[in-house]
Amino acid sequence: MKLIAVSGGPDSMLLLDVFKHHDIVVAHVNYNKRNSSKRDQKIVEDYCFKNNIKLEILNLTDYEVKGNFHDWARKKRFDFFKLVYEKYNCDEILLAHHKDDFVETFLIQKNQKRKPLYWSIKSKNFNFGMNINRPFIHKYWKNQILKILDNKQIFFGQDETNKENIYLRNKIRNNLLNKEFLKRLIYIKILFLNFFKLRKIKKIEQDFNKWKEQNFDKQNFLKSKFQENLITIFISEKTNNSINLSRGKIQQIIKFINSEKNEKKFILNKEFYLVKAKKIIKVLKK
């Protein structure tokens, strides 16, 4: 069985329509933060009822969020997805990311001066204890999705806050509006960058697996010439990809591991910290 994350927006509604005849269950999260939230939920409910599709809904109303709302919402969302995934014994979760998301994520990474092992978003990966699949990531642009929905007369909701330059992704998205040729050039550039990284990625994965077999001991880490990459994978794996690491932060972590001083811990964020216990590197929750 496949789990499909459906917000009621155009991308996820097309994804749902494409897979409606498969063995699926739908998960919808309503943050009740926008006036149109109830409308989006009803769109999903009506479609699932009409097509006899199993639907699980999470309604959130607690907004005592300390820090970044998007980080909080993402954690709540994926915690819920994991529960549904396990309840129905799903083999994968489908997400509706498309080519525009692919380009935007790359530009966000560049803006934040990040140096990921793989630029932008993978079509398939394993995270949060789930097999994640993004069928549209190299298939459709946003404008293509909208045309298909119009032709098939599929109802969907538009998030009106996307037009507001509140968040970095919104600013990048709005800056790329009507710049189709530029988006395509950036898309091709990302594919080339990732292609030339393949050999390096294989070597890094070998080093990481070797380090993992040694229970993430300090000595094996120090032997690798890919320390920055090992830290990125290690932190991502141990925190379910919940921490955005800048290059500066990665360098601080490496300095902490290398240090012979009796430093007990390195704070990663409000939830996680790093420790050196008998020359073994660990990520712990506060």
UniProtKB/Swiss-Prot annotation:
One matching Pfam family: ATP_bind_3
Reactions that this protein is recorded to catalyse: cytidine(34) in tRNA(Ile2) + L-lysine + ATP = lysidine(34) in tRNA(Ile2) + AMP + diphosphate + H(+)
GO cellular component, one term: cytoplasm
Disulfide bonds, paired cysteine numbers: none
Keywords linked to the UniProt accession: ATP-binding, Cytoplasm, Ligase, Nucleotide-binding, tRNA processing
Keyword Secreted: no
Signal peptide start and end residues: none
Primary subcellular site in the record, as a coarse category: cytoplasm
Any GO molecular function: tRNA(Ile)-lysidine synthase activity
Binding sites annotated in the UniProt record for ATP: S7, G8, G9, P10, D11, S12
The enzyme's E.C. designation: 6.3.4.19
Any GO BP annotation: tRNA modification
InterPro entries: Rossmann-like_a/b/a_fold, TilS/TtcA_N, tRNA_Ile_lys_synt, tRNA_Ile_lys_synt_N
Subcellular location: Cytoplasm
Domain remark text: The N-terminal region contains the highly conserved SGGXDS motif, predicted to be a P-loop motif involved in ATP binding.
UniProt family annotation: Belongs to the tRNA(Ile)-lysidine synthase family.
Described function: Ligates lysine onto the cytidine present at position 34 of the AUA codon-specific tRNA(Ile) that contains the anticodon CAU, in an ATP-dependent manner. Cytidine is converted to lysidine, thus changing the amino acid specificity of the tRNA from methionine to isoleucine.
NCBIfam families from the UniProt entry: lysidine_TilS_N
Name of the protein: tRNA(Ile)-lysidine synthase
Organism encoding this protein: Mycoplasmopsis pulmonis (strain UAB CTIP)
